[in-house]
Amino acid sequence: MDEHEIAWAAGFFEAEGTACSSKRRDRPSRERNMAVYQGGRAAIPEALLRFHGAVGGRGNITGPYRDRLFHWSTKKNAAFDEVMALMWHWLTEWKRAQLRTATVTAGRKMPPVCADEADAPPTLRSTQLAWVAGFFDGEGYIGASGAPGRRTIEMSIGQASTDTVPVTLARVALVLGVGNLRGPRTMANAWSKLPQYVWRANAFGDVQFAVAMLWRWLGPVKRAQAREALLRYQALGRAA
């Protein structure tokens, strides 16, 4: 398997994935569930198809639910363990803890490669960038706005946290080497009552650099958004 695609999948799972255990309807034991969600209507989102391929075709994609949501998921123990093991070395401790809790509460043992003392393989900068691209494909924003002489551009990723800067955002800032970490900020939105942190790049040069670094591993949706933002920003400059 391509380790860059696995690193991308791990980043995407950090952004959009979840793992838990729940009681089974037909017996007293608990079962694990791993899922990744994406909005979509007419067709399965490309990002879910890519994730499915990156984890070796394990799990299933279903939807749309209520005509707006698809998800990849697996409840099979073998597939759960295999997907967890594939992504483990690129996951943050927060996501590892979620997978570990789901496994332990279901009465299962962690795969040896996922043991706390397991050594991580050497991590290439290219796989770090692939992870960031996956995370950005899931949670990122890029856009340009304004008018001639008053143009702005922004590339950002927001995350909620109860206490400190999320390790995911710290990793993004470290790998890309541009932009700033900001927060915490209390949001007015009803959907999130937790303080919000954000990694953000507002300088055109920083945004252009970050896009160039991630381009090889970004999905088509974020590529199109990035291209549109950069071109719009430049067009507003020419019109000034």
Regions found by a protein language model. Name each.
Residues 1-240:
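Internal intein/HINT superfamily modules and their associated LAGLIDADG
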